[in-house]
Amino acid sequence: MPKLLAARVALILAAGLNLVPLAYTGLLIASGTSAGGDYDARLRFIAANPVMWSLGWVLWMGGTVGLVLSIWTLNRVMRDRPGSNATLLSLATVFAILGGASDIVGDAIQVTTYPTLAAQYVAGGDPGTQTTRLLFDLVDHLSTALSGGVANTLYFVAGVLVVIALARVGDFPRWITALGGVAWLATLGATPAIFFPSIAPVAVASALFLYSAWLGAIVIWGMGTRSTLASRFTSSAPRV
């Protein structure tokens, strides 16, 4: 597959892998999230829908892979462009991978531990119910810290490094640089917002929509009809 086409596909896929779980969560499993109510309501919802719940967080794991893929793709495609900084792009990839690792662990807790605790909560009586609620509270804070706190912060660092590196490419569109800056600032803003259930869904959705718009802008820019635009996404072929 030509390098230009591969880059387009990877960036579009990355956006889709994040928008799908966002929609799935909002439509199907929001009642089990921190925005869904108190612990009793959340646990009962998860206990009643364990497969649907776990599937949602498996989809979020796919979103994690997509985000790391997008940073890796931009590193691979843009590192040799005139003015770009390969060191910044490489560092961005490292931060994205570290963030992805933390995110995957947090999501894995959601997939495996939440349904188990929810089933125990529904089946048990006092004082077992209180113990289960305490464990759920601890696990909930841990998974939130890993996915929403640590991962989002590392993603922010990775994203900012990419934005800076791309901004140094001579005629890279400045409006895409600005859009990228806003997108990654929104990601940073979503980090504390996850601890406030009333605003968390809006903060996370805004960050992901802006991130996807940024990727889309890069894809469209790379799909320009002028050869000078398209050539930036193609490898330098040897001349004979």
Feature annotation, model-predicted:
Residues 1-240:
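Hydrophobic, aromatic-enriched alpha-helical segments typical of multi-pass transmembrane helices
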